[in-house]
């Protein structure tokens, strides 16, 4: 992600996914901007002289584990119907979708270990699926026992611009 760190900017704190880059340019994914901002280019959010920070994008794998030994304590993995799930928000269809972790049992059958879409196994391993900042995830502990999570990282403690979705693009739970 590219984050605006210029405290004098109207867009201070806003994140944008880096979709491509090389030595001289960065391409940002602006598909998730507000309806009122769709005509804006990256230079609106980051005019010349704006201070920025490049932040690694959190993914299903980097947050919840890339291998069975990385998973939260007491997390149940395996086939979708017998495992615990993480729900992630899909802003395209405005709904949460479940993901499960498939361990090593099915690797010989061509199913590598990793995170899969519970509703569409054919999508393949989705361990690199991005979890956007300020978007919630839901933990569904569908098996017995208590799961324990440990997260590492930093939390912003200064005031930032909060992006609220336009009407009709939110869910109350």
Q: What feature does the model see in each segment?
A:
Residues 3-7, 87-91, 140:
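A generic structural motif
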Residues 47-94, 143-173:
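Catalytic cores of histone-lysine modification enzymes
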Residues 13-15, 20-23, 49, 81-84, ...:
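Extracellular structured ligand-interaction cores
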Residues 98-154:
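Charged, amphipathic alpha-helical scaffolding segments
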Residues 15-19, 93-105:
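Short amphipathic beta-strand/extended segments with alternating polar/hydrophobic composition
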Residues 44, 129-130, 162:
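Residue "hotspots" at secondary-structure boundaries inside conserved domains
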Residues 1-57:
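Ser/Thr/Gly-rich low-complexity blocks that favor extended beta-strand/coil architectures
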Residues 28-30, 124-127, 170-173:
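Exposed aromatic-hydrophobic patches
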